[in-house]
Amino acid sequence: QMEQQDLLDQPEQMEQQDLLDQPEQMEQQDQPDLPDQQDQTEQPDQQDRQDLLDQQDRSMTEHKYKVVVYAICKNEEKFVERWYESVKEADEIYVLDTGSTDDTVKKLKECGIHVKTKVFKPWRFDVARNESLKMVPDDTDICICTDLDEVFMPGWRKELEKYWQPDTTRARYNYNWSLDENNNPIVNFYLDKIHTKKDYKWTHPVHEVLTALKEERVVTIDSITLNHYPDHEKSRSSYLPLLELSVKEDPENDRNVHYLGREYMYYHKWNRCIDTLIKHLSLKTATWKDERAASMRFIARSYFHLKRYREAEMWLKLAIEEAPYLRDGYTELAFLYYSQEEYEKCIHTALQALKIKTHPKTYINEVMSFDGTLYDLLAISSFRLKQYDYAVYWNAIALEYKPDDVRLQNNHQVYLQKEANPND
């Protein structure tokens, strides 16, 4: 009996001037201002001397900007050393611990990191982020917010200084939200949590965003990459009530209404998901086609699980119409047809999906659209239609994506046997 995959329940796809590498020879006016030698009546205290030495030290290095990393954490002792190694190119590192009961704080201090502890009740991500941002010194030129389960690829500091301009307020960079066992990106998009200090604040209780307080000047730096290695043991149970609070506080915020509907889907609250995402689509500010199409796909998934397959088909067709340049709507429609044993429609739809070669760098992209699943569906559907040569052909391509997949390997043997002896 051939196994079938339920591709509809997917994990969250996450909540993206060429300068010389070295500054020119320093001139005299680049030196820091020294104390007035004429006035010896008031000597600088020890802290003032240290600040002056720090300022002079920075002026004599290759770095043009003061770069500070900041983060929040709780019970993440197993990530501390790896995270520190990836961010230590910064001038200073500040971490706000929100109530760890393990050795997180101890390990952070052993790395020389500035640590403060504060417990927030009730918990909100934006409040904690803003509190951690307060720890960053006011003379910081560039702030970088990361989490302890993330790792910068080496050399990010040099690339940041290469592309950051005096009037830049924010930088976008590559974020690998999910990676395979060989450290190859599965889900990749731009992240933009590198910023100036005084021009931003964090907003929203969960899926918090960095909100600009003035006009932005954003630079995209493709040569900076941040990898995400999540702790799958951590609970995300707080997300749903925080999202409900977020939408209650700002019911017209299309982004958070979309996130809330998606969260209902993850909790299998199908009717709430449908109602919430229909509301998202009705909002005047909900204009981003990728996200609108995602809401339509999630509505379709909910109808699928309610066994209302024609409504699911209708919403997937609407998703394709909304964003015909994305594979995702076609992929899920192909799966719907496959699950309903409409194999000719499955093949036609999967082939339409494969005509789309672009893979946008946004958080809204489904792994199954680019991981060989379409070839798997083509192979099984071809087999059901007794097109055994096509089944072999398509499954061979699926195996190129997943050579160690036992199900695909077993299916391939079945396809080969049927191709050789179609009447058996």
Model-flagged regions — what are they?
Residues N130-I142:
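Active-site nucleotide-sugar/metal-binding loop of Leloir-type enzymes
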Residues D126-L133, F152-D275:
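Catalytic-site signature of metal-activated, phosphate-bearing donor transferases
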Residues K78-E81, D102-C111, G155:
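Acidic helix N-cap motif at the loop->helix transition within catalytic regions
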Residues V68-E92:
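Short, well-formed alpha-helical segments that are part of the catalytic scaffolds
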Residues S86, L96-K109, F120-P122, D147-E150:
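A conserved acidic beta->alpha catalytic loop
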